[in-house]
Amino acid sequence: MPKVGMQPIRRQQLIEATLQAVDQVGMGDASIALIARLAGVSNGIISHYFRDKNGLIAATMGYIMSMLNEGVRARRQALTDDSPRAHLKVIIEGNFDASQVNGPAMKTWLAFWASSMHQPDLHRLQRINDHRLYSNLCCQFRRALPLYHARKAARGLAALIDGLWLRGALSGDAFDTDQAIRIAYEYMDLQLAKQER
């Protein structure tokens, strides 16, 4: 009989082992056996908690996305300035948070994006994440710009954030968070300046 309260601990242990496995060998070679070994559990535990490897991958991405949302939320709560610019800055910073630009997270994101084109559950998660970023950006730009320009600015900034993240992840060097944030801020400021015209 399982110990009461072990499920959240065990699930987190398996998610962290999945991140470690993907970092070490990639998504394709991150077998259930390897993940279980890294977590120090039997293979059957993964099936018990997640059904299969796809369920574990979806849970791992859910965890990474929740870390992204938490990074933005924590920054938003610390704001003393309620301007659209301040809110846009925390969205940008949250997307380049250490939880999103470390090796295991970046490799898992990259593998997730590739897999999401073929697996409906992962595709659904990707659409949710994409819509959340766009919606949050559009909401803040809308406070300063007409709807058409707000939508256009939100699409552009979302694409820039993803592009900067992707280039940083694929560079092979340490992710230059400061540079990525500076470039995104410059784009944001160019868009917000349109309200003054």
UniProtKB/Swiss-Prot annotation:
The keyword Lyase does not apply. Gene3D superfamilies: Tetracycline Repressor, domain 2. GO terms for biological process: glycine betaine biosynthetic process from choline; negative regulation of DNA-templated transcription. NCBIfam families: betaine_BetI, PRK00767.1. Repressor involved in the biosynthesis of the osmoprotectant glycine betaine. It represses transcription of the choline transporter BetT and the genes of BetAB involved in the synthesis of glycine betaine. It comes from the Bacteria. This is HTH-type transcriptional regulator BetI. Residues 31-50 bind DNA. Pathway: Amine and polyamine biosynthesis; betaine biosynthesis via choline pathway [regulation]. Residues 8-68 form the HTH tetR-type domain. PANTHER family: HTH-TYPE TRANSCRIPTIONAL REGULATOR BETI, HTH-TYPE TRANSCRIPTIONAL REGULATOR RUTR. Keywords: DNA-binding, Repressor, Transcription, Transcription regulation. HAMAP family: HTH_type_BetI (MF_00768). The lineage of its organism: Bacteria, Pseudomonadati, Pseudomonadota, Gammaproteobacteria, Pseudomonadales. It comes from Pseudomonas fluorescens (strain ATCC BAA-477 / NRRL B-23932 / Pf-5). GO terms for molecular function: DNA-binding transcription factor activity; transcription cis-regulatory region binding.
